[in-house]
Amino acid sequence: MKKKLLALSLVLAMLSACASTPSDSIAATPTPTEAPAPAAEPTPEPTSNPSQTPAPTMAVYDEVSFDDWRAAAGCTMPDYSFSAPHTPQPFEKVAWPAEGVTLRTYVADTLEEAAELYHTTVETLKELNPDYEENYTRNHGQYWGLKLQAEPYTLPMNNVVSVTVSAPWVENQYDRTGTYNVPASLDKQAQAALATAYYFQYKWCGMHGGFWPYEPVDDLPKWLQGYATDGAFYTKFSEFSSFLHGVYSDAWVDDLLNEEPALFAEGENDTILTGDGDRGSNVAYCGHLFTEPELQPDGSVEFWQLVLICESEEFAGWGGEEPVVPDTATVMPIRLVPTEDGWRVNGVNLPN
């Protein structure tokens, strides 16, 4: 039986680097259905002026195939299967909004950071959010949920590919497999890298934190609980490091392994020291969509993950007969950076 060794309040702090939207309550995610999606509509851009585009700084690399990327990982990688491209499908009790949604930011430390992330200006953010100072104080020194444009935002219905990621050696059946939608216009290697990031973070660095099973060890630093044993995703730190660097940018990996308190650390004899904990999810989560990935002047690829939430006071959970219609989209930018060995994910926030 897996031990819950940390109080939820501590766990939420430990998972902050890997977490997604703020946790309101714990609820099962509604099951997607095969209901047809509405026809795509033109997606208006935010009305603000875009910030200055970055100067080209990254080298140009030849495309790396999915098979070559997986073979060169330097560790045992999961198995993958890819669906055909398809339109996004709503959850069983969700209806796509017909009249657009309120577009909001995720989180930023400063207005300048928010303006750069969301391609707008500080002046526009202040105009759209007259309570921005209260927002900063209320959220303990950060900006959350700033409005990005005055008019309703029409959701894009860009095609996605469903990627199933499976690690058959993992002991916990729930952690063994996951299926995640990614933009269909990414190449296969980029699709696999992004789906793997979702898989890793949902299973061990987001909804749950840390590998299991593990052997408890006393007197470890901070919230580390023991070292991963057979049946865990990885048991050797060298393999785990190769996995991380094969999926994520070096900068993201450095942040993960050097954060305080640490969720993972290298132990003696190439072992993996691991934490252990869980967090809740947002009961009003209604799914997520993507904008179309765009190549940036610096060589990276960027797009938005649009996290759909129902903020209406009339929302009373998922037990009613009427479908739930999301009214807000939280924008979480995703960036893939090129390397000689293929695309790497420069961090991704879980949509829920």
Kindly label every feature range from the protein language model.
Residues 1-9:
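Positively charged n-region of N-terminal signal peptides that target proteins for export
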Residues 14-17:
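C-terminal motif of bacterial Sec signal peptides marking the signal peptidase cleavage site
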Residues 279-352:
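Exposed beta-sheet edge and beta->alpha loop/turn motif
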Residues 19-28, 35-37:
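Bacterial lipoprotein signal-peptidase II cleavage site
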Residues 61-64, 69, 86-122:
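Primarily a LysM-type cell-wall glycan-binding module
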Residues 36-57:
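Ser/Thr/Gly/Pro-rich low-complexity, disordered linker/stalk segments of secreted
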Residues 76-101, 122-172:
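Extracellular LysM carbohydrate-binding repeats and other cell-envelope/extracellular binding modules
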Residues 175-277:
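Core segments of small alpha/beta cavity-forming domains
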